[in-house]
Amino acid sequence: MRNILYVQIIFILIIAFVTPIKSYAFNVAKHISNVNGLTNNSVNCILEDAEHTIWIGTWDGLNAYNGREITTFRYSKNNPNSISNNVIRQIIECKGSLWIATDNGVNRLDKRTRQITRYYLRTDNKVPNQEKSFILGKSAAGDIICLIKGLGFFVYNDSEDEFNPINTDFASH
């Protein structure tokens, strides 16, 4: 009887010590840098999306890390479907897209197609003549809202695929 008790105690101790080792054996941190594909080592923002891709905004482009490889997105003046600027300030996720604030506008990246759309948030839809500060957020209803220094608040209208200004008294002060 006593031997059975000892065997049970030893069995419980073995399970208690082996289980944590097994469960943590696959959690390996990997260092990524410009040596293995990151566009720049100076990171401005990081987001893990719903599919567990890590999006890294740097001073020299946007990077997507899926656990195996890094895909980069950079500005190209000859490609209107490229990101609007290489300085990535903020990344948020909403309704299957990533919204990216750069020093030269807001961009939407469709994660499924990897198509990028630029939004300059001006009435003439041209590139701003100077860098602006863009801050992105989501409303309680899931709308994308953008605050632009010197211009005020804008809300994204999905049906028109554009940002519309929000009239507020304090935005112009």
Locate each region found by the language model:
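Carboxylate-rich, polar loop motifs that coordinate divalent cations or form catalytic acidic clusters
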Residues: 1-173
